[in-house]
Amino acid sequence: MTPKRALISLTSYHGPFYKDGAKTGVFVVEILRSFDTFEKHGFEVDFVSETGGFGWDEHYLPKSFIGGEDKMNFETKNSAFNKALARIKTANEVNASDYKIFFASAGHGALFDYPKAKNLQDIASKIYANGGVIAAICHGPLLFDGLIDIKTTRPLIEGKAITGFPLEGEIALGVDDILRSRKLTTVERVANKNRAKYLAPIHPWDDYSITDGKLVTGVNANSSYSTTIRAINALYS
């Protein structure tokens, strides 16, 4: 029997972003929880980034944001999570036909590379065309800007409903002016540009995720578990 396999994408960007000079990159909580959930549901999980590199968002490191099993999995060198991270692939090394689910994790680093990550977009579109699922969380839907449905040659999210981190959340974090000054986009703008319907949560920190066919999106790290479960359910629907 062919094993069930999921591919989690990471942003390759790891550079200065915050006003205090701290770097952004991958939001560790999102990938810890999605990885754990996939594994507990019988999936083999691999990580990929556009360049094969990644770094952690320095404002959201484990000491403040995780505990219990998540913390143990992050800090244990030979945990399944860290072993998978050590095998991270560049996007051009990945065979899309090996996977049933593409899961775009985020962190503010995704603002910089996801909209132009052509190889990641190519993998996601092929998985979707083969009957697989595309899921994205928080800033992950920025990958949809330029992602094409192979069968229609139209934007893959056109006519579909998506969610993702809202501008209200950027304002609450005090980074909305950084987005403006660096000409970085938002999930809602990507939705509008590609003729999708953006559905906002009542509050930016709510656990909120939605499914539209084989497309699944979640609004923040608190939605990691529900988004992953929706992706698994969508695969078998």
From Swiss-Prot:
Predominant location: cytoplasm
GO cellular component, as recorded: cytoplasm; P-body
Active site feature: 138-139, 170
Keyword Membrane tagged: no
UniProt entry keywords in alphabetical sequence: Cytoplasm, Lyase, Stress response
Location in the cell: Cytoplasm, P-body
Catalysed reactions listed for this entry: methylglyoxal + H2O = (R)-lactate + H(+)
Signal peptide (residue range): none
Annotated EC: 4.2.1.130
Disruption phenotype: Results in higher sensitivity to oxidative stress, reduced thermotolerance, accumulation of higher levels of reactive oxygen species, and reduced chronological life span.
GO annotation, biological process: cellular response to nutrient levels; methylglyoxal catabolic process to D-lactate via S-lactoyl-glutathione
UniProt keyword rRNA processing present: no
PANTHER family recorded: GLUTATHIONE-INDEPENDENT GLYOXALASE HSP31-RELATED, PROTEIN/NUCLEIC ACID DEGLYCASE DJ-1-RELATED
Record's function text: Catalyzes the conversion of methylglyoxal (MG) to D-lactate in a single glutathione (GSH)-independent step. May play a role in detoxifying endogenously produced glyoxals. Involved in protection against reactive oxygen species (ROS). Important for viability in stationary phase. May negatively regulate TORC1 in response to nutrient limitation.
Protein name stated in the entry: Probable glutathione-independent glyoxalase SNO4
Organism: Saccharomyces cerevisiae (strain ATCC 204508 / S288c) (Baker's yeast)
The encoding gene: SNO4
